[in-house]
Curated annotation (Swiss-Prot):
Gene Ontology terms: cellular component: nucleus
Protein name: Squamosa promoter-binding-like protein 16
Gene name of the encoded protein: SPL16
Residues involved in Zn(2+) 2 binding: 159, 162, 166, 178
The keyword Methyltransferase appears for this protein: no
Domain of life: Eukaryota
Induction / repression: Negatively regulated by microRNAs miR156b and miR156h.
Region entry Disordered, spans: 182-204
Keyword tags: DNA-binding, Metal-binding, Nucleus, Transcription, Transcription regulation, Zinc, Zinc-finger
SBP-type Zn finger ranges: 115-192
Function: Trans-acting factor that binds specifically to the consensus nucleotide sequence 5'-TNCGTACAA-3'. May be involved in panicle development.
Length: 455
């Protein structure tokens, strides 16, 4: 309901005159324009005059109240007093439209919010009392650890790392996490275990001249020897296959009246003829070349033994070989190791016997001496510069002090024959034993035992 508060001044005075004429003695208060702007009616007369409420909208007279009563001004939004039910309904609608809408609270709001339930078929567990983890992933605490559950008609299991249900094929037995997550987790956690057979602590590798618990495999190969003698201006080539992998790498020889034989590596027998009076056959150049070729790993420079005094045969000479020297061999004398084992290697040379330990566990290294020459008769033989010469006054063969780079030494001992030294350039091999010096055919039958040491 709207009020028209603006009235022209002429209409106000005309209305006051009409009321005054019809009132019969009492002049009602006139409504002025200023009072109309403030309220619906004003007090225009004295104390005895009546007040009127002017309805500006309808233009009719209001109800007259008692004397001294203050006029009541209608306020917008409030239903008029004394009006019908239509005015009251209109005021209530205006008040409802001006108030903001509010959301319902309390029990109604709790009923509208749905509580999550367990995703397992047939489970009616109330998750409102469970932890937030179980409410968020919609699984109860019991089914999160169950190895087999049915979800949407399929057999599944809850993965505690993925926080999801997976099929049973994605799990390992007795594992609560799926295989995909455990694969990367175990790879980061577990350290690789070293192979015990390939461990460096289990098998010591060979460093320099040290020994390993197992024999180092060496490849089988064939090498070509090049032999040149002083008498012949030509070189002779010999190719001998070496069966290194076999355990028959031993020197097995025998002494005969005709000469000294060296069957080496099962390649046949080679005779070194000395031209002795006991039926020895002189060794020709071809036999000497073949013998030196066979013994190429052992000798750097080998000279054929000269015939003794009074015996016919080939003269002394030198043979040069291009192979590496790992052992020294003197065919005029012999040394033997005491207490040699049964599987040791033996060489029978001219009445003496050399007993050598098996070489399959002793790696051969650098050459020991660069040259070796056989002398004849009672004269002194020319050896390498590292050892002094000693000549017996009685005309017997000279003995020598042999000094090698491996720290092997043998003092000067007078005997009837030159001594054979078999050594290895292994600086860290220690071996204590005795050398037996003297041949079987010595004149006095005495022998000397010499201590020696390999450092």
């Amino acid at each position: 309901m709207e009020w028209d508060l603006k009235m022209p001044p002429a209409a106000s005075w005309e209305l006051a005159d009409e009321l005054e004429n019809s009132g019969g003695g009492g002049v009602p208060a006139a409504v002025s324009s200023s009072s109309a702007a403030v309220g619906g009616g004003v007090n225009a007369g004295g104390g005895g005059r009546q007040e009127c409420s002017v309805d500006l909208k309808l233009g009719g007279l209001g109800e007259f109240g008692g004397g001294g009563a203050q006029p009541r001004v209608a306020v917008a939004g409030e239903p008029a007093k004394g009006k019908g039910p239509a005015a009251a309904a209109t005021g209530a609608a205006a008040a409802a439209s001006s108030a903001p809408a509010k959301r319902p609270r309390g029990a109604a709001a709790a009923g509208q919010q749905q509580c999550p339930s367990c995703a397992v078929d047939g489970c009616k567990e109330d998750l409102s009392k469970c932890r937030d983890y179980h409410r968020r992933h919609k699984v109860c605490e019991a089914h999160s650890k169950t190895p087999l559950v049915v979800v949407s008609g399929r057999e599944m299991r809850f993965c505690q790392q993925c926080s999801r249900f997976h099929l049973l094929q994605e799990f390992d037995e007795a594992k609560r996490s799926c295989r995909k997550r455990l694969d990367g987790h175990n790879r980061r956690r577990r350290k690789p275990q070293p192979d015990p057979m390939n461990s460096a602590s289990y098998l010591a590798s060979q460093q320099g001249a040290r020994f390993s618990p197992f024999a180092t495999p060496r490849p089988e190969a064939s090498w070509t020897g090049m032999i040149k003698t002083e008498e012949s201006p030509y070189y002779t080539h010999h190719q001998i296959p070496l069966g290194i992998s076999s355990r028959q790498q031993h020197f097995v020889g025998s002494t005969s009246d005709g000469g000294r034989r060296f069957p080496f590596l099962q390649e046949g027998e080679i005779s070194f003829g000395t031209g002795a009076g006991a039926g020895g056959v002189p060794m020709d150049q071809a036999a000497a070349a073949a013998a030196a070729s066979v013994c190429q790993p052992l000798l750097k420079t080998v000279a054929p033994p000269p015939p003794p005094h009074g015996g016919g045969g080939s003269g002394g000479g030198k043979m040069f070989s291009d192979g590496g020297l790992t052992q020294v061999l003197d065919s005029d004398c012999a040394l033997s190791l005491l207490s040699a084992p049964a599987n040791s290697t033996a060489i029978d040379v001219g009445g003496g016997r050399v007993v050598v330990q098996p070489t399959e566990h002793i790696p051969m290294a650098q050459p020991l001496i660069s040259g070796l020459q056989f002398g004849g008769g009672g004269g002194s033989s020319a050896w390498f510069a590292a050892r002094p010469h000693h000549q017996a006054a009685t005309g017997a063969a000279a003995t020598a002090v042999v000094v090698s780079t491996a720290g092997f030494s043998c003092p000067v001992v007078e005997s009837e024959q030159l001594n054979t030294v078999l050594s290895s350039n292994d600086n860290e091999m220690n071996y204590n034993g005795m050398f037996h010096v003297g041949g079987e055919g010595s004149s006095d039958g005495t022998s000397s035992s010499l201590p020696f040491s390999w450092q």
